[in-house]
Design a protein with these regions (language model features):
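PLP-dependent enzyme catalytic core of the Aspartate aminotransferase-like
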Residues: 154-183
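Short beta-strand-to-loop capping motifs
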Residues: 26, 122-126, 160
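Short amphipathic alpha-helices in soluble, non-transmembrane regions
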Residues: 132-139, 172-177
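Flexible, glycine/charged-enriched surface loops at secondary-structure junctions
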Residues: 83-90, 107-112, 147-148, 183
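Conserved active-site segment immediately N-terminal to the catalytic lysine
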Residues: 2-12
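Conserved PLP cofactor-binding pocket of PLP-dependent enzymes
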Residues: 140-157
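Active-site C-terminal subdomain of aminotransferase-like
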Residues: 15-99
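Conserved PLP-binding catalytic core of the aspartate aminotransferase-like
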Residues: 92, 108-137
Length: 183
């Protein structure tokens, strides 16, 4: 539908599962292309992995994390019950809420043409102590992410994906306002 030939993701993001498993799918076109790739290695040899799975009645080349597979089965059922488009719309509504809040109290870090539906990176325009803020948030049962590398303490991240709800977004943003005594 979207023309994607290879898609790789992990279980711990928008699927809202524990980390521990990568998920990959490839189109027939991508599968055929793998035949001409020299030195595919072992770990990323998608052709060999696919062929083995097909020959051995879906037995994987490595031991999979079976508990995550069962959890993913349940989670995919939940996603289908909600409806994929409804889930995307919920993520987008939460993203818009967080961005609006960020614009009021800080600023959104990313270029507006490249915003994510699942995570908002916020510029630390008030030079707050993000670690201290996070410590109080953790005591209140929530957490945000500090920036990485050169952006550590210059940005922070609020996720709006998986099973999170608009109430969760209202809660974390109002708690940040309360903790920092923002006006």
């Amino acid at each position: 539908k979207l023309g994607v030939d290879v898609l790789v993701t992990s279980t711990q993001k928008a699927l809202a599962l524990p980390p521990g498993m990568a998920v990959c799918t490839l189109s027939q076109k991508a599968y055929e292309r793998t035949a001409s790739v020299p030195n595919r290695g072992c770990y990323f040899d998608l052709r060999s992995i696919y062929d083995t799975i097909q020959k051995k009645d879906y037995q994987y080349t490595n031991t999979p994390c079976v508990s995550i597979m069962y959890a993913m089965d349940l989670q995919l059922q939940r996603i289908m019950q909600e409806g994929v488009e409804n889930r995307f719309a919920r993520h987008e509504a939460m993203a818009e809420f967080v961005r609006s809040w960020a614009d009021e109290y800080f600023s959104v870090f990313a270029n507006r043409d490249h915003l994510s539906r699942t995570l908002t990176v916020i510029s630390n325009t008030r030079d707050i102590d993000i670690a201290a803020l996070n410590n109080v948030l953790i005591e209140r049962g929530m957490q945000l992410g500090n920036g990485y590398g050169d952006l550590k303490n210059k940005t922070f991240r609020i996720a709006h994906m998986g099973e999170l709800t608009m109430d969760d977004m209202r809660s974390i943003t109002s708690n940040i306002v309360d903790i920092l005594k923002l006006k």
